[in-house]
Swiss-Prot record:
It catalyses: GDP-alpha-D-mannose + 2 NAD(+) + H2O = GDP-alpha-D-mannuronate + 2 NADH + 3 H(+). GO terms for molecular function: GDP-mannose 6-dehydrogenase activity; NAD binding. InterPro entries: 6-PGluconate_DH-like_C_sf, GDPman_DH, NAD(P)-bd_dom_sf, UDP-Glc/GDP-Man, UDP-Glc/GDP-Man_DH_C, UDP-Glc/GDP-Man_DH_C_sf, UDP-Glc/GDP-Man_DH_dimer, UDP-Glc/GDP-Man_DH_N. It is an enzyme of class 1 (oxidoreductase). Its EC number is 1.1.1.132. The active site is at C268. It comes from Azotobacter vinelandii. The keyword NAD applies. Keywords: Alginate biosynthesis, NAD, Oxidoreductase. Pfam families: UDPG_MGDP_dh, UDPG_MGDP_dh_C, UDPG_MGDP_dh_N. Catalyzes the oxidation of guanosine diphospho-D-mannose (GDP-D-mannose) to GDP-D-mannuronic acid, a precursor for alginate polymerization. The alginate layer causes a mucoid phenotype and is essential for cyst formation. NAD(+) binds at Y10, V11, D30, K35, T86, T124, K271, R331. This is GDP-mannose 6-dehydrogenase.
Length: 436
């Protein structure tokens, strides 16, 4: 494919070398004449192992050249990758001046181009940037319609400095955010020979995926450091602790606990997070990430309450009171906390949880349910259909499979709030998810 790459910094230069190395005809574009001269001499403008050889081979074979002329590059290629920088402002927001200027020039070049062109944003931009900034500028300066006259896609990069070429050739996945199917197909064809899954999503989803991955990486580093600091204060080698923690691929390093939803609860997590946070404070150890977990957890319960409250109806059904399906354990249950909030605010609440109801009458937790939370116990009902019928707002509190149908087929005249993830997809209908 004929590809132009705008911005020849770390991302752009690596992409230029790797794409030309795989047989594509590449035109590198940069405002720096010095960088363009280096590219045309087959030299790398950055320090990256193996890149110089790739660029030299690309120039030697005629598959790679550089230019400062945006129009020339757009007219000579089928697809353009925007790899320009998006530095931080003093307030933490993104500086989009480079993106905006390139889009203006690219839009002007597209005005006179008859062949369909695809614009790919590889720069890291916040969700909404392509729809609210990139596309409007391209359409204004080209006089054309995105998704009709030209294609638009997002292709976040996951390259690490010093291992960028290996990361390009052996990615964990290739993420494509597509405005239209044709744009996604054209971009996907570039990566077809890589041994990695190609994930095609909407543009905003792809933008968010990039930030989520980077923030997750930063979170892991910070978490390990805080654990290490607390461990050292306890006379323990934090490296030894984390080595064993990382051996667990079933829970610790897995998809488990990695789905948005309601807050965590149960007998272990809240208690242990609180205990470790307290001990860190006692030892004068700064652990702001770990110390923030309980506050963040409480905020998620508050968000669930706010979602219920905004509907205006006072008749609410809470389906699931225990912190997870298949148990009667109410210790630190966020569902129980939510119920307490609703009761305290005067909602007419009815609750269905057959496990908790059974435990109240027959189980070991009966004393607690009847004597410690009698105001909640009195609201438990045994007829699911009746509970649903008498409510205006139905809250799916835990993953009891009996509740799933309500998210997919909302009863007429009802609102469903899904705290679990039963909804098959985000919709604008009568069902709403806490994070979707």
């Amino acid at each position: 494919m004929r590809i132009s790459i705008f911005g020849l910094g770390y991302v752009g230069a690596v992409c230029a070398g790797c794409l030309s190395g795989r047989g594509h005809e590449v035109v590198g574009v940069d405002i720096s004449a010095a960088k363009i001269d280096m590219i045309n001499q087959g030299k790398s403008p950055i320090v990256e192992p193996g890149l110089g050889e790739l660029l030299a081979e690309g120039v030697k074979t005629g598959r790679l050249r550089g230019t400062t002329n945006v129009t020339e590059a757009v007219l000579a290629t089928e697809l353009s990758m925007l790899c320009v920088g998006t530095p931080s402002k003093l307030n933490g927001d993104l500086e989009l001046d480079y993106i905006e200027e390139v889009c203006r020039q690219m839009g002007s070049a597209l005005r006179d181009k008859t062949e369909r062109h695809t614009v790919v944003v590889r720069s890291t931009v916040l969700p909404g940037t392509v729809h609210n900034v990139v596309i409007p500028i391209l359409e204004e300066f080209s006089g054309k319609k995105a998704g009709v006259d030209f294609g638009v896609a997002v292709n976040p990069e996951f390259l690490r400095e010093s291992t960028a070429i290996k990361d390009y050739n052996f990615p964990p996945m290739t993420v494509i955010g597509e405005l239209d199917k044709a744009s996604g197909r054209r971009l996907a064809s570039i990566y077809a020979e890589l041994d990695a899954p190609i994930v095609r999503k909407g543009i905003a989803v792809a933008e968010m995926i990039k930030y989520t991955c980077n923030v997750w990486h930063a979170t892991k580093v910070t978490f390990a450091n805080e654990i290490g600091n607390i461990a050292k204060a306890a006379g323990v080698d934090g490296r030894e602790v984390m080595e064993v923690v990382c051996m667990d691929n079933k829970l610790n390093l897995s998809q488990y606990y990695m789905r948005p939803g309601l807050a965590f609860g149960g007998s272990c997590l809240p208690k242990d997070v609180s205990a470790l946070s307290y001990r860190a404070h006692l030892w004068d150890i700064e652990a702001p990430l770990i110390s923030s977990l309980m506050r963040s957890n409480a905020a998620q319960v508050q968000k669930a309450y706010d979602m219920i409250d905004k509907h205006g109806s006072r008749k609410v059904a809470l389906l699931g009171l225990s912190f997870k399906a298949g148990t009667d354990d109410l210790r630190e249950s966020p569902q129980l906390e939510l119920a307490e909030m609703l009761i305290g605010k005067g909602f007419k609440l009815s609750i269905f949880d057959s496990n908790v109801e059974y435990a109240r009458d027959h189980g070991a937790n009966g004393h607690y349910i009847k004597n410690e939370i009698p105001h909640v116990s009195a609201l438990l009902q045994s007829d699911l259909d009746k509970v649903v019928a008498e409510a205006d707002v139905i809250v799916l509190g835990n993953a009891d499979p009996r509740f799933e149908k309500l998210a997919k087929d909302v009863p007429a005249g009802k609102k469903v709030i899904d705290l679990v993830g039963f909804m098959p997809q985000r919709t604008a209908g009568a069902a709403e998810g806490i994070c979707w």
